[in-house]
Amino acid sequence: MIVFDHVSKVYPNGTVGLDDVNLTVGDGEFVAIIGRSGAGKSTLLRAVNRMHRITAGTLTVNGTDVSTLSGKALRQFRRGIGMVFQSFNLVTRTTVIKNVLSACVPDMPFWRVLLGAFRREDKLKALESLDKVSILDKAYMRADQLSGGQQQRVALARTLTQSPRIILADEPVAALDPVTAKQVMQDFVHINQEMGISI
């Protein structure tokens, strides 16, 4: 559950990003925030995983006051929250599966990261995530050979591989054509309904 209780965010230059926001998102809910450009939608999302610090109020996620987290506790907290952005943030000159496996890197010993030695269970989980977004057949293709919609699905599969309880999607279909955008949104709905992940 995500609870904004009188949350405000004022940037150092004086710009108000959020002004006394009260909002509760229950476990497993699918919520869309709609508003004009500059209304604070991205600020609201980024406050949830503490990419932005709030300046007033209380923000709790699954009972944890986000503003109290730092260091290792903050990194661990963020592992439970997946982010999907408008830009896909893929390494386009490598394979789809390697992009998805990058979700496992924070939990790996340094030597495994250095050698690219992913565990069998990590590989199986990555393949399972690709299957959930209907692009398992693209696993060993280079990411730059995929369409925009397919690349966004790779980003979503990468997020699923980290086993999040919450997925925050910041304009995930803004760069896609209407037909592809609808397909990607259907993937989000399917994941929400089948896996109970809050989106």
Regions found by a protein language model. Name each.
Residues 167-170:
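Catalytic Walker B motif of ABC-type/P-loop ATPase nucleotide-binding domains
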Residues 34-36:
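The feature captures the beta-strand-to-loop junction immediately N-terminal to the Walker
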Residues 142-146, 150:
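Conserved ABC ATPase signature
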Residues 178-180:
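Helix N-cap at the start of a conserved alpha-helix in ABC-type nucleotide-binding domains
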Residues 66-82, 112-120:
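ABC ATPase NBD coupling module
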Residues 49:
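Helix-to-loop junction immediately C-terminal to a conserved catalytic motif
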Residues 161-165:
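A short, proline-enriched helix->beta-strand linker immediately N-terminal to the Walker B motif
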